Amino acid sequence: MGFDPKLEITCIDGKMKAGGLTVRTDDPTQYLRELLSSYRSPRFDYLPSFTGGLVGYFSYDYLKYSEPSVRCGEQDEDSFKDVDLMLFDKVIAFDHVRQKIVLIVNMALSDVEVGYNKAKLELEQLVSLLKTGEKKQEAPGRLLGEVTPLFSKEQFCAMVETAKHHIREGDIFQIVLSNRLSAPFEGSLLDTYRVLRTINPSPYMFYFSGTDVEVAGASPETLVKLKDGVLHTFPLAGTRPRGKTDEEDKALEESLLHDEKELAEHNMLVDLGRNDLGKVSKFGAVQVEKLHSIERYSHVMHIGSTVRGEIRDDRDALDAIEAVLPAGTLSGAPKIRACQLIGELENNKRGIYGGAIGYIDFTGNMDTCIAIRIAYKKNGRVFVRSGAGIVADSVPETEYQECINKAKAVVSALTLAQEEDL
């Protein structure tokens, strides 16, 4: 848990803000790299994996800085930031296994004695706060109206048909189209996060509250992970709903693993993952460690694979994010042309959805997930977005329903959070 951020860094359309400073830039990645260079720390194995660094999100639309040919949609009525990160040098880590809290404060080494005394005082203040601090009661979240889609079933199916035309013409092989649900909303998403932990436990559970946006999510999919020079990405593509019984669940698994359309889509995205990691990996170091395993979640199951690489000496975590974002499972193949068509067909900036949520720490390591299975709130509205992979033989109505299925867990969490005493 990040506590008392030292700095919040945001960027929208090249306008970068950090604290009270505002600059114009065509390369926010380089700005972030220079910022991180001032905060370097060794890795201590006895401490939790994250001991301080940048935490937050890179939006789907962050792609425009590395690929100017991509137009990420004209409509942007909610003005989500391209990047929103907080710099934490104080961390509260809770060990669920040992039921212990670890308090971490980073200290400057320019004057060791002064830095040590300052860090010691901050730790004492943290201990005091945890023991005696007042509990801040967030206003309960509440839906104030009907959850409505951005695209009707007819509109979405028409988008699918247009995408299939581009596939038949050889323009693309696959594309991921999304739909967005939204509703008027008041209060906090913190209870929604708590419900998600119960009904949709996932590898990545997160709650993030920035200056003007709030995000709660349960993402099943890593975007890219960097640990001690080793890169990993885990493509998930191919979906079935969970069965009501073990027998039905197993039958759905067999159906998924023998579905030529789903396997073709998945294999295409594994190749795309290999290509993305290859941009920043040492020559010959990229390999597929695991292929076609079934990953089960509360409402759906997916086909999953694991791709590994070793980062080049002249590349870093920020380069890896640029190389992989957005994931092939949220864009298509070839990626750049698919993203161009997404901008034309959806004509609505995706914002946080399909971007990266996670951290880059002071040691240079990184862990980010794809921003899916999330609820995000801004300007008195809550949003849930989900997508479906379109290939040559896709059935439009089936793809529309896949978007609905993927959104169910998050919509259920929003509803349950206002009904239960949490």
Where are the predicted features?
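Extended alpha-helical targeting/anchoring segments
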Residues: M1-L422
